[in-house]
Amino acid sequence: MKRHPFLPRREFLRAGMTLAAATLAPSTVLAQTELLTRPVPSTGVRLPIVGIGTNRFRSGDPAWTARLRDTLATFARLGGKVVDTAPSYGDSERTIGAILGETGLRDRLFLATKVDRDAIDDGRRRLEASFAALGTARLDLVQLHNLRGAGTLLPLLR
């Protein structure tokens, strides 16, 4: 019988069986029972320290949108909560709004967006457009994007 110079048959079989058995074991990556969280200072609500950014959550062909929907559903199923978006991320707010409407995930997520206008009226319109695009009456967090208009927009956000 000819022997392979690098891996004897017995070791090859042992490695193959070990690999096969490993696929039957629960994944340790997904086995984590609880995400690391921190409390929001003003409310005490605990949120995971890691969220999902949605700059690339833009509409495309139906297959791409299905992948985005699956990604967001998996994120929520594994305990993710914070979803961060912005009007400047193309049509990501509209895409996320459609996905939230289809999946019913809105109440399970902490939805954050941004505003970045110099004038208060422009900022108000930008926020109203975000509410409409996201298909929600509630935003959990509104951030100043790049601090643009901070002096005029802070009163609006309060």
Range-by-range predicted roles:
Residues 16, 115, 145:
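Residues at the C-termini of beta-strands that transition into short coil/loop
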Residues 108-110, 139-140:
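Residue-level recognition of the N-termini of beta-strands and the immediately preceding loop/turn
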